[in-house]
């Protein structure tokens, strides 16, 4: 039986989840293109804008396990619909902002809360529930690949609108694109009518507190969660600060949008590859290899002045290594703990990812405002990335994943 035949009953749900994810991730990853014109127009500092992005990441991270736990009680559809509505409101508030407060609430709090309801953890939990074990890792890679197709479209569209009509019209264009999330969330919500498949290590019926205790009793999960910090730090540093870095270096403003688009395009290939690879080799070793490889690419790029070709090659390499982490993390969590609490446990791991994102966004802006350069910021990112990747690989090779120790409610 072909892959298409296996997936046919789940195709509407998978398409809804994938399109919702590609819009939510794509628009968010492209907000950095508005950094320079927005901050100059409403007279706020670079670090103020990046503080809002940092708060977005914290809100996303700390609300992710809450959203995941609520899907067990209320179902996925209402959570995703609320998230889509919050995204639209957040972007609209940004488009009419006259100062820092509106940017903080719109780009920070509202979009952050929305991402907890529409981002990778929820989208991939929906996908994982809808397919069999045999194709699950590959399907998670496909859905993860969709996460950057939005950036492939959104970044160039936003840049063109911003250059031609101003940054407010650019963000208004994002508002229009975000409306697509509402019907997609509704369609993906059909998964609520499906019974939850069971797995060998399924935690099953228990409380959220007991599920969390079970997760953190697993040493492999703890190491994987700690290493996840570097993923958020590196990726948010790039999406938030690369446009500003290229502008400082006197490069064509369109280059940043083109590079974000290249990242999106090559992420499709990377996510598909790592989704496929995760079904064949150790997911945790592959995670460590991604962190090490990203760090090497970052060091290579920032050690020399940027060129057009070098920047696009950097975008291609980083894109390949971008969201491949998603299917590997979610697949490993399903293997360890099952499907019922996947979204919540994935959210617990994601909190650490978002602490890294806070450091990448706000820390990068603070270092730039203080030193007038991004040199120290990328050096920190490379050092921490190499350390986390090596520890992740060593632990995965020396200690196989533990069976879950079930906690009592």
Question: Positions of the model-derived regions?
Answer:
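Helix-to-loop junctions at the C-terminal end of transmembrane segments
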Residues: 63-76, 271-282, 369
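Extracytoplasmic gate region of multi-pass secondary transporters
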Residues: 31-35, 218-271
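Cytoplasmic helix-loop-helix junction between adjacent transmembrane helices
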Residues: 107-145
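Hydrophobic core of transmembrane alpha-helices in multi-pass small-molecule transporters
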Residues: 102-118, 310-324
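Helix-loop-helix hairpin linking two adjacent transmembrane segments in secondary transporters
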Residues: 143-193
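Conserved MFS/SLC helix-loop-helix module at the cytosolic interface between two early adjacent transmembrane helices
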Residues: 62-101
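C-terminal transmembrane helical hairpin of 12-TM major facilitator-type secondary transporters
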Residues: 263, 281-332
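Intracellular juxtamembrane helix-capping segments at the cytosolic ends
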Residues: 38, 117-131, 324-337
């Amino acid at each position: 039986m072909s892959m298409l035949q296996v997936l046919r009953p789940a195709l509407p749900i998978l398409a809804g989840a994938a399109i919702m994810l590609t819009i939510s991730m794509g628009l968010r990853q492209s907000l950095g293109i508005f950094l320079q014109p927005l901050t100059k127009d409403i007279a706020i500092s670079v670090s103020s804008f990046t503080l809002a992005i940092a708060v977005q990441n914290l809100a996303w991270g700390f609300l992710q396990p809450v959203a995941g736990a609520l899907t067990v009680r209320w179902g996925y559809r209402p959570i995703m619909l609320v998230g889509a509505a919050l995204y639209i409101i957040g972007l609209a508030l940004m488009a009419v902002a006259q100062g820092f407060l509106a940017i903080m609430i719109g780009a920070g709090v509202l979009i952050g809360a929305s991402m907890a309801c529409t981002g990778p953890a929820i989208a991939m939990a929906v996908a994982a529930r809808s397919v069999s074990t045999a194709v699950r890792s590959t399907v998670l890679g496909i859905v993860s690949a969709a996460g950057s197709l939005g950036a492939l479209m959104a970044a160039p569209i936003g840049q063109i609108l911003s250059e031609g009509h101003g940054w407010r019209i650019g963000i208004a264009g994002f508002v229009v694109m975000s409306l697509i999330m509402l019907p997609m969330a509704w369609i993906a919500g059909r998964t609520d009518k499906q019974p939850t498949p069971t797995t060998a290590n399924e935690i099953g019926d228990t409380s959220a507190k007991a599920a969390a205790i079970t997760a953190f009793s697993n040493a492999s999960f703890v190491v994987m969660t700690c290493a996840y910090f570097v993923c958020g730090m590196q990726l948010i540093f790039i999406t938030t600060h690369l446009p500003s870095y290229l502008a400082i270096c006197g490069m064509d403003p369109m280059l940043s949008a083109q590079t974000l688009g290249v990242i999106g395009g090559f992420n499709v290939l990377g996510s598909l590859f790592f989704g496929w690879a995760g079904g064949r080799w150790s997911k945790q070793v592959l995670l460590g290899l991604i962190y090490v490889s990203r760090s090497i690419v970052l060091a290579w790029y920032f050690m020399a002045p940027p060129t057009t070709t070098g920047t696009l090659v950097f975008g291609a390499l980083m894109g390949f290594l971008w969201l491949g982490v998603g299917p590997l993390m979610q697949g490993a969590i399903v293997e360890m703990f099952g499907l019922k609490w996947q979204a919540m446990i994935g959210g617990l791991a994601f909190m650490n990812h978002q602490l890294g994102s806070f450091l990448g966004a706000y820390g990068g802006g603070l270092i730039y405002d203080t030193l007038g350069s991004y040199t120290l910021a990328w050096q920190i990112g490379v050092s921490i990335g190499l350390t986390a990747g090596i520890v992740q690989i060593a632990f995965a090779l020396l200690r196989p994943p533990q069976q879950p120790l079930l906690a009592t409610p």
